């Protein structure tokens, strides 16, 4: 699983027999089981006549042991919520996994969260990160902290090389630690 957590730019949907493919698939199925009703939800997924994203969407819309749509109703939202959970492993509902403890840093014997491609806390000059390739349905995580800079609005721009690339921004409230997705 850590091979994918350290290389989450690799797709969860494309299967190329890489160790990371097994790790990403394992964590994704644990996430679906955790939030959609456990073993019965996985059974529902495996028995579905639909394939790929459509099968996952069907289970999410009519789960055996959870509220419909709890993690989203289309694959884009389901995948975004999964990658947030695999990055944060928060105890804030869908942004974590209760059936797997994930450590912030990768070690030899622990499962780890998605590792950031880059971090930044120096805002004395503009920050830029280039050359971050991502396979379809892969993810790149960047961690930004305020550092010693005074509070100011943060402007972000994402430029993808391919149409249809999407991004999600998660922010954490200083007052209570609650995460917000935008």
Segments predicted by a language model, with ranges:
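Acidic/His/Gly-enriched intrinsically disordered linker/tail segments
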Residues: 1-35, 46-86
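Loop/turn elements at helix/coil->beta-strand transitions in domains of secreted/extracellular proteins
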Residues: 36-41
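Beta/coil-rich, acidic/histidine-enriched accessory regions frequently appended to metallopeptidases
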Residues: 51-182
